[in-house]
Amino acid sequence: MALSVLRLALLLLAVTFAASLIPQFGLFSKYRTPNCSQYRLPGCPRHFNPVCGSDMSTYANECTLCMKIREGGHNIKIIRNGPC
C-alpha cells in the first residue's frame, strides 16, 4: 500500500515537472505571428507596448518586431505581450 502511494506521488511529481517545461521550451506553442502587414514603412509609432519575441528579445512594440523580421528575414513569433 505504501509503495503504491509512493509511486502515485512520484508520478504526480513527474507530470507536474513536465507540464512546467512546456511553456519554457515552447512545446505545444501558442506563439502568435505578428501582423506586420498593418505597419507601413518607414518607421514605427513611438508608443511603448512591449512584446517578447521568440528570439527572447523584448521589442518596444509589435511594429519594431516587424522591422527586425523585415531587415533580417527572421521568423520571429510573439511569445507574449510584455517584456521577456
Curated annotation (Swiss-Prot):
It is found in: Secreted; Cytoplasmic vesicle, Secretory vesicle, Acrosome. The record marks R46, H47 as: Reactive bond. The gene is SPINK2. As a strong inhibitor of acrosin, it is required for normal spermiogenesis. It probably hinders premature activation of proacrosin and other proteases, thus preventing the cascade of events leading to spermiogenesis defects. May be involved in the regulation of serine protease-dependent germ cell apoptosis. It also inhibits trypsin. Keywords: Cytoplasmic vesicle, Disulfide bond, Protease inhibitor, Pyrrolidone carboxylic acid, Secreted, Serine protease inhibitor, Signal. Changing F48A: Reduces inhibitory activity towards trypsin. Residues 30-84 form the Kazal-like domain. It comes from Homo sapiens. It comes from the Eukaryota. GO terms for cellular component: acrosomal vesicle; extracellular region. GO terms for biological process: acrosome assembly; spermatid development. Expressed in epididymis (at protein level). This is Serine protease inhibitor Kazal-type 2. The keyword Ion transport does not apply.
